[in-house]
A protein has these predicted regions:
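Alpha-amylase-like alpha-glycosidases and glucanotransferases acting on alpha-linked glucans and related
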Residues: 1-175, 179-186, 192-207
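Structured C-terminal cap/extension of enzyme domains
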Residues: 183-238, 243, 250-255
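Generic secretory/membrane-interface signal
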Residues: 66-67, 119, 238-245
Length: 255
């Protein structure tokens, strides 16, 4: 705060040079964070400290042009965190997998979304959607199949139904992991929190995405109005050019 949050301004400025949007992890930590004395081997002597709150975000919004932020607001949130999120105007996260957790009244169900949020089928910390479905049992499995109208269909069809559920929601932004588009199981999971081992080792290879998959990815994006403006304009031009070519061909045939 003494230097106008210089480190944060530099970091976020650089991030916006690299990415379209930046997700701020553990958003609640900017309201309150648990501080443990350096060198302690346990958290017993830790205590809650106040974070910078909106003072930091006002500074970032003022210093960085076109700053786009996603606030990771998952888990337990205090009233003051919710107030900070609302004041910031940043969209929070909605994870579809969290919607089917034994309750049929979850705030993660799409019909409860408002526009200012980002929907994910799952994140890097979740199972892939296929892996999650394969491990789901009992009431939760029944409810998710009912919700997406996918009763007896193969699991890959259910994965695509969940992708459509996310894309068709009112959320301003939808994020679909490539593992879900490819209908990969948990062998392609990115990270299992609080574990050691093969985390962050999965890689996408060039031959994993077929032209058919690319077509389906683009089509569901188009159908639900989520194509980038440039792509929409290009598609409109291509359609117009095709129609003009057909008209010229018809004129030639008539003559």
């Amino acid at each position: 705060k003494k230097d106008g949050y210089g480190w944060w301004v530099q970091r976020m400025t650089h991030c916006m040079e690299l990415y379209d949007v930046v997700r701020i992890d553990h958003f609640r930590g900017f309201d309150e964070y648990y501080a443990i004395p350096y060198g302690d081997k346990t958290a017993e002597r830790g205590k809650w400290e106040k974070g910078p709150g909106m003072d930091l975000f006002h500074t970032l919004d003022k210093k960085i042009k076109d700053l786009r932020v996603i606030a990771e607001d998952l888990g337990f949130l205090t009233e003051s965190v919710l107030e900070m999120l609302k004041e910031s105007g940043y969209p929070g996260m909605k994870v579809l997998q969290f919607a089917f957790d034994g309750s049929e009244d979850s705030s993660y169900l799409p019909y409860k979304y408002d526009h200012n949020c980002v929907v994910y089928t799952g994140t890097h910390d979740n199972e892939t959607t296929k892996g999650w479905l394969e491990n789901l049992q009992g009431h939760d499995l029944k409810f998710v199949r009912e919700y997406i109208n996918c009763y007896e269909q193969p699991v890959n069809d259910c994965v695509w139904a969940l992708i459509r559920t996310a894309l068709s929601s009112v959320a301003d932004l939808a994020v679909i992991p490539i593992q879900d588009y490819l209908c990969l199981g948990n062998e392609a999971r990115m990270n299992a929190p609080s574990t050691f081992g093969d985390n962050w080792k999965w890689r996408l290879t060039a031959n994993q995405i077929s032209e058919t998959t690319l077509y389906h990815m683009r089509e569901v994006t188009r159908i639900y109005g989520r194509l980038a403006k440039a792509s929409e304009e290009k598609e409109t031009d291509e359609i117009a050019n095709t129609e003009e070519e057909e008209r010229q061909d018809n004129d030639q045939n008539l003559s």
